[in-house]
Amino acid sequence: MLQRLVVALCLLGFAALTAAAAHQRPNFVVIFTDDQDGIQNSTHPRYQPKLHEHIRYPGIELKNYFVTTPVCCPSRTNLWRGQFSHNTNFTDVLGPHGGYAKWKSLGIDKSYLPVWLQNLGYNTYYVGKFLVDYSVSNYQNVPAGWTDIDALVTPYTFDYNNPGFSRNGATPNIYPGFYSTDVIADKAVAQIKTAVAAGKPFYAQISPIAPHTSTQIYFDPVANATKTFFYPPIPAPRHWELFSDATLPEGTSHKNLYEADVSDKPAWIRALPLAQQNNRTYLEEVYRLRLRSLASVDELIDRVVATLQEAGVLDNTYLIYSADNGYHVGTHRFGAGKVTAYDEDLRVPFLIRGPGIRASHSDKPANSKVGLHVDFAPTILTLAGAGDQVGDKALDGTPLGLYANDDGNLLADYPRPANHRNQFQGEFWGGWSDEVLHHIPRYTNNSWKAVRVYDEDNQQAWKLIVSCTNERELYDLKTDPGELCNIYNKTRAAVRTRLEALLAVLVVCKGESCTNPWKILHPEGSVNSWNQSLDRKYDKYYANVAPFQYRTCLPYQDHNNEVSAFRSTVAAAAAAAAAAAAQQPGRRRMYTWTSAGRQLSATASAIATSPQPRSEPFVAEVERHSVPVPAEVLQSDVAKWFDNPLALA
């Protein structure tokens, strides 16, 4: 009798644990690199085999995923806040129009993804690069929203072999002779173990610096000056001889290396010299160094997946891989860098695996839905079971098109729009400088806007770029993916006028108008897509829409300088939408997964916490080798270090 009772109790206990696990919300692990392109083959399985083994093959790649402000700090803010830079007004790497002080003064960390997730019962973790000028001078002013944040601090952020971190605002430590990505991997594994032991769902973001350029900053007592030096990325010692036969991919469909004829480009690009053979040889080595620096990131992926697997949480975890912005090497007339409106700088990798996502099992099938960094936060919230809250946060993004790869177990209320976004805008304020060919002078007037239209069936793909000088470029991306032939004055008026109208709306969009600009252009509802807009009966209307114009070139956002006929219309629509949302009854249900995964039940019950919470965090082995940052560095004037902010981005 006693034996039967014990068996019965065991079965009941197992059933309870199974039910609790079935209702536990998913975890998220995001591996977020720095300056990794989505075009020049940096994620090829030859160079990142573990990325494919652990994320691409068990998941999917979004092949049309873009950033909209191609420089690190504004782009990271787009990711966490779900808003375009013209709505965050965080537009630069450093102050006064960017930088950590402005980021805090804008209150961005009062309402962004980690805070929202904590409000849902998640623990949140961060390790690696946060923002460029999070430094030895301001580390105590910790960004809100993180259960545990172990962030790189300047001047050690881009020092591959001497990284420095501050954990939760503590005095920074450095790790002399230890490779930055390896230190981040050790710390990330410890954070994940801590997160699992806490027994709550978690979001962990891991942000290595590769393949960003290396930066050395030090004070020269003889010259009584701070000196900053920029170099190509530095691989881990064990990876220096990898990929010695790799070359810049001239065989891609873009074919825009060392563009000879730039007569149709803006004046500042026409003034750039064509790279000579010695420069090209150097750029080839820069390309190889970027690939080699990513080899340690690939090893990091392997360690993270092994940790999740050993902890038994891999199957309930979304594992995501992406980057803060794209990067070009040798394209057009450029050496190496970012911040242009061309696709090399805008397109980034985005790979994801997790509950409900059908495995691709190869590199060939891919998701063709357009995705942007502003879509990231609403996607995470929706997958976390809080899709009903997305509309409350004034976001410009919408959940990614993961429904196209539903294996039958994706959330039942995951949005499945009839018309997924097929147009978006890009924007940048500031200058341009070449990050490796330092003999090329810096150009200060590189502010620009762009609009890109993409037909999922690949029948049409267009891009319009407007420089702050009001010079215009238009490319047919279906026939010219390398953006070599500017056809602004050659294409038919119907295409040109529709693109101009879309740009005029999207550069000032807020909320719904960012995903559906047609509602602003055609409030009566007669047009809901690019193809519908091309009907000849609308030719006269579009011919009379005033194109977007700059009054002058400025390195920052000024609404009076950026002239759009739709600014007041968009603002009124956004205000009306906010007022309507405020009148809606509050929906604050906490959604949980059922064992089938397809259905959701509304409940206020606590998150399953099968393991007993662990009070002390796991400590990474590498911590034994850390030493305090020298006192003279802690007392130095950080502002003097930033003499080339674009190279630091």
UniProtKB/Swiss-Prot annotation:
| Catalytic-site annotation from UniProt | C72 (nucleophile)
Subcellular compartments = Periplasm
Q: How is activity modulated by pH?
A: Optimum pH is 8.0.
Question: Mind telling me which PROSITE patterns this protein's record contains?
Answer: SULFATASE_1 (PS00523), SULFATASE_2 (PS00149)
InterPro entries, per the entry:
Alkaline_phosphatase_core_sf, Arylsulfatase, Sulfatase_CS, Sulfatase_N
How is the protein's activity regulated, according to its record? Inhibited by Na(3)BO(3) and KCN. No inhibition by sodium dodecyl sulfate, even at high concentration.
Q: Does the keyword Hydrolase apply?
A: yes
UniProt protein name: Arylsulfatase
What are its cofactors? Ca(2+)
PANTHER family from the entry?
N-ACETYLGLUCOSAMINE-6-SULFATASE FAMILY MEMBER, SD21168P
- Can you summarize the PTM annotation of this record? The conversion to 3-oxoalanine (also known as C-formylglycine, FGly), of a serine or cysteine residue in prokaryotes and of a cysteine residue in eukaryotes, is critical for catalytic activity.
Residue positions of the PTM 3-oxoalanine (Cys)? C72
Q: How does activity depend on temperature?
A: Optimum temperature is 60 degrees Celsius. Thermostable.
GO BP terms, alphabetized: phenol-containing compound metabolic process
What does the organism's lineage look like at the top?
Eukaryota, Viridiplantae, Chlorophyta, core chlorophytes, Chlorophyceae
Q: What is its main location?
A: periplasm
